Amino acid sequence: MEEGGDFDNYYGADNQSECEYTDWKSSGALIPAIYMLVFLLGTTGNGLVLWTVFRSSREKRRSADIFIASLAVADLTFVVTLPLWATYTYRDYDWPFGTFSCKLSSYLIFVNMYASVFCLTGLSFDRYLAIVRPVANARLRLRVSGAVATAVLWVLAALLAMPVMVFRTTGDLENTTKVQCYMDYSMVATVSSDWAWEVGLGVSSTTVGFVVPFTIMLTCYFFIAQTIAGHFRKERIEGLRKRRRLLSIIVVLVVTFALCWMPYHLVKTLYMLGSLLHWPCDFDLFLMNVFPYCTCISYVNSCLNPFLYAFFDPRFRQACTSMLCCGQSRCAGTSHSSSGEKSASYSSGHSQGPGPNMGKGGEQMHEKSIPYSQETLVVD
């Protein structure tokens, strides 16, 4: 994930076309405003997610909560840097904070990009194991804990983001008094080979940070949807409404991720390849101008997840209500009652066939036939 507006200088490469660059002036005010909005919503929402996860006892935490908490930490780590980038953009890409903050804030952006998508992938794989391969899931949990898995994901994200810490620097913009925060490959490349590093790092970050994880997520949710559909085909008509709800949650997760990230990665990759393919001037300038807005869309994902939790996860809604009520018994009682009713209604559509826990001929069904409850379908 790159800071959006200063496209060329972010990668440390000049536009090799002879096109005359014309900026979309509206971005100078609009983009900083979006950054600050994401900062406010992201710090509040992700802080609330962390509070919700860690306020519950260890026994009540779901297997996916470690990934949810890790995702919130990644988003929170990123959004706290947004005031710096908002200032940078508002000052027409003049960096006043020094070289170290340029390196660190840029590094945290990339750590967030990798850590977030890896956590989402880990969460998707966790749901796949819990729903599609419950036996393998139980065996795997005996060997690898969620904490160990997320630690590995964070180490991998930190290593993949390291080139930014190495190559990011500040420098005076030619013929101006502005100081820019950009990628400088001079320590490893000549001026003529800068583009190779630019293209190599840009395409590899898109491949590792989007294409591969997104493919894994799609695969996991495909098998999850297939398993859920097979389960509900065995139920009566009243189960169809729950079936549609569960499948819609899966679609929302995948589509939201794609809508937030695909424009950014697509535009970035097209621009990187422009050094090789030599796009027409109009198209090249369009990519340069639209990229900051694609970046803003990807940034929105860092504050969007808490709203998805609030919409789809009854337990998260109950925790939020409890906090807003400040522990008042009347409000807490109402929230508890409402949550209980929703939970009962939600799980009944998953576990019941002709009667409560009854199979054909009135035979008692075993608990293992209920792997599709709210507990295993926790959303992203």
Swiss-Prot record:
Residues 342-380 are annotated as: Disordered. Pfam families: 7tm_1. One of its GO terms (biological process) is coronary vasculature development. InterPro entries: Apelin_rcpt, CCR1-9-like, GPCR_Rhodpsn, GPCR_Rhodpsn_7TM. Residues 55-64, 126-146, 224-246, 313-380 are cytoplasmic. This is Apelin receptor. The lineage of its organism: Eukaryota, Metazoa, Chordata, Craniata, Vertebrata. CDD domains: 7tmA_Apelin_R (cd15190). Keywords: Cell membrane, Developmental protein, Disulfide bond, G-protein coupled receptor, Gastrulation, Glycoprotein, Membrane, Receptor, Transducer, Transmembrane, Transmembrane helix. It is found in: Cell membrane. The keyword Cell membrane applies. Residues 371-380 have a biased composition (Polar residues). GO terms for cellular component: plasma membrane. Glycans are attached at residues 15, 175. Belongs to the G-protein coupled receptor 1 family. Residues 1-30, 87-99, 165-198, 271-289 are extracellular.
